[in-house]
Design a protein with these regions (language model features):
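Feature captures hydrophobic
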Residues: 1-251
């Protein structure tokens, strides 16, 4: 597993899930009410992005030029330590906003962990199950793009993906797309509608969850009609090769 690739996943896919968490979970939304602060994560030889909290909403933007609180990391490994709890960052600016980082932001990340690594009992609640699965869906789509751009094996597979969009969807639920341009992948978290060259659709949210958790086999699910693929099959095939790498980074 490559530390730099993991850093891109941890920032763009894991922390990048916080805006959606704040949108979907009332408890998260309450934590950012009335807050006006932005937290920048600046990883040397790695990614840089800012979480912006304003007007009761959260957004994720590239770069750290306009952040209030800046958290620098000397290497991808140090940043990955933030996610696994082995690194305590020291901000280089924004000390007056540090209270939000220590209290509200920590509670947000704990809440996110509850949804991304849920207890089995929690998944028995239909609302929690749906929210958790949708968060996982978008996280996996983003992680797939990051692996295709940074992981050596992922880049090899991305090298065979022709320009276009692979729509990834859950029947009766969300849809997103992996867009390829000159073998660089971008995760588009909006429903592409009919703007795609190939498609992979999970039958329903329960099938998607079983696949995400590794409880059912993807190839067998295609044969059983639980996963539908169409369009340029070579695109889907190479995306699935990258998808196989996702579990390595998210475990």
């Amino acid at each position: 597993m490559d530390a730099k690739t993991l850093a891109y996943i941890n920032l763009n896919a894991i922390l990048g899930s916080i805006p959606r968490l704040c949108e979907m979970v009332p408890e998260a939304k309450k934590l950012i009410e009335g807050k006006d602060v932005s937290i920048g994560f600046d990883v040397k030889d790695g990614p840089a992005a800012t979480l912006v909290f304003k007007d009761g909403k959260c957004s994720f933007v590239d770069g750290v030029d306009k952040c209030d609180v800046k958290l620098p990391f000397s290497s991808p490994e140090k940043f990955n330590g933030l996610i696994d709890g082995t690194t305590t960052p020291i901000p280089t600016k924004g000390f007056t906003k540090f209270g939000f980082l220590l209290k509200n932001f920590t509670k947000l990340t704990d809440l996110l962990t509850n949804y991304l690594q849920p207890e089995p009992a929690a998944l028995k609640d239909p609302t929690f199950f749906e929210t958790s699965t949708i968060l996982m869906f978008h996280l996996i789509v983003e992680a797939l793009a990051q692996i295709g751009n940074h992981d050596d094996i992922g880049k090899f597979s991305a090298g065979y993906i022709t320009d276009g969009a692979v729509k990834v969807a859950i029947g009766g639920g969300p849809a997103a797309a992996i867009r390829a341009k000159d073998h660089v992948l971008t995760a588009d978290h909006e429903d592409p509608g009919d703007d795609y060259t190939s498609c992979m659709e999970f039958q329903d949210i329960h099938v998607a969850r079983d696949l995400f958790d590794g409880n059912i086999n993807a190839v067998a699910s295609i044969g059983q009609g639980k996963v539908r693929i169409c369009g340029m099959i070579s695109q889907v095939d190479n995306v699935n090769r990258i998808l196989d790498r996702v579990a390595l980074y998210l475990t």
